[in-house]
Amino acid sequence: MMSSDLRLHDEALRQATGRNVKVAVIDSGINAHHSHVGKLSGGVQITCDANGEIAFSDDYRDYDGHGTAVAGIIRAKAPGVALYSVKILQDRLQTESRVLAAAIRSSIANDIRVINMSLGTHQISGIDALRQACEAAAERNIILIAAGSEERVFPASFSCVLGASGDELCGWNDYAYTENSEVEFRAHSWPRPLPGSPQGRNLRGHSMAAAHVSALVARIVETYPRSDGNAVRETLIRECTRGVDVEDDALNLDPTREKSPADYRPKQYATSNRRERQS
């Protein structure tokens, strides 16, 4: 595991693993058979049925690879977490905002402590229901992390959500903080390397940065279990290895920032997932 290499100021955080912290990955599902993930503690798929109603099923398998890559980062940096898959992204990694809102409310009902959303939308349709779901989770002391960018993206731009973007200056162990920015936190924009595959062919971007932040949040929650969103945010700021000048922020953001999570085509990771399922 790479988690012991994190350069954290707090000794207690360095020793933490996220043990028993319930983390929901709202994404394309998770492949529990992938070596980067290991055991899952549960999962659900949430969709809209033929009548336009929210529907639930227990098939949260990942046929794309995006959610598995996200889960692999969290497992590497916080190996003790209890991972839950909440599958909402379907073909082309798309969904509706009301499905995301339902996923957040489902996570509330299942006593999730940390919600990772490596996704986002610029659309304002349905935004009120999404904001209300995020606020309901935050009121119950659930920490929400979402992928963002230099443009306004939801839910990362909500005040009750910790926004994270990929920064090309951040290595695997680095975190950066941007004061007076809607998306305050920066992190590494790559997942774990895939054996036998050049890293350049792997996923990258803001989605992966959100997972890096979620892993550190899980360690914070384990160490300081009564922390609310504000306390977790302050701890994150203290642990950031550098600050980012908001005027120079766009220069450091990962070059793939123009692509939203819905644009990713992680063929190499998906191929690896299929190969491991068959072995």
PLM feature spans:
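A cross-family glycoside hydrolase active-site/sugar-binding cleft signature
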Residues: N116-G120, A147, A211
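Catalytic-core regions built around general acid/base machinery
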Residues: E11-A12, S125-L144, F154
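Extracellular S/T/G-rich loop segment that most often corresponds to the catalytic His/Ser-adjacent loop
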Residues: E151-E222, R226
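C-terminal subdomain of the subtilisin-like protease fold in secreted/lumenal serine endopeptidases
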Residues: M1-M2, L6, I112-N116, E222-S279
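Subtilisin-like peptidase catalytic core
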Residues: F56-H122, Y224, L236-V244
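Active-site core segment of subtilase-fold serine proteases
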Residues: M1-K77, V81, C170, S197
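Proline-centered loop/turn at the N-terminus of a beta-strand
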Residues: K22, A82, N141-I143, L162
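Structured catalytic cores of enzymes that bind and process phosphorylated ligands/cofactors
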Residues: L6, V25, T68-G72, K77, ...
